[in-house]
Design a protein with these regions (language model features):
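Extracellular receptor-binding modules and their adjoining Ser/Thr/Gly/Asp/Asn-rich linkers
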Residues: 1-144
Length: 144
């Protein structure tokens, strides 16, 4: 392939084996019991974070099949977010929460006056605010 791809939607996703149907916006982690598969996240700050279930990816890789989900790993995608404890503002870093399939604000660690976010846990940056409660916001995915 050569040239520019013009896509209506804004993320890149791949068909990945999963445990049944997963709703769009669900944060997923590597399935620790199955090779090359994902499952909804359920642990806060999980370093096995793998992406977010996409509704309509701009670019979709792989082959569809039973028990597969479209997992976005880059681009902009709607994500289930929990802001019951801390408000989420534009630009905030998001991580997995203990609420299944849901992201939350990343609270940095203070290491001798230097604040750092836990490596390997970041899902992406909030592109929309969520002042309180639970909801779905647009996130710029940048797994790290």
């Amino acid at each position: 392939m050569d040239g520019i791809i013009n896509a209506k939607y804004q993320d890149v996703a791949e068909w990945v084996p999963s445990d049944g149907a997963l709703p769009a916006g669900t944060v997923v982690v590597l399935n620790r019991l199955k090779t090359n598969a994902v499952a909804p996240s359920a642990i806060a700050y999980d370093t096995a974070v793998a992406g977010v279930v996409s509704d309509q990816p701009g670019v979709l890789l792989g082959v569809a099949g039973d028990n597969k989900a479209k997992i976005a790993t880059t681009g902009r995608v709607k994500v289930h977010v929990d802001a019951r404890t801390h408000a989420v503002n534009i630009g905030d870093l998001l991580v997995t929460s203990d609420l299944p399939g849901t992201a939350m604000l990343s609270e940095p660690l203070d290491l001798g006056g230097v604040k750092i976010h836990r490596p390997g846990t970041i899902i992406g940056k909030a592109l929309e605010p969520l002042p309180s409660g639970q909801g779905e916001i647009l996130v710029l995915l940048s797994l790290q």
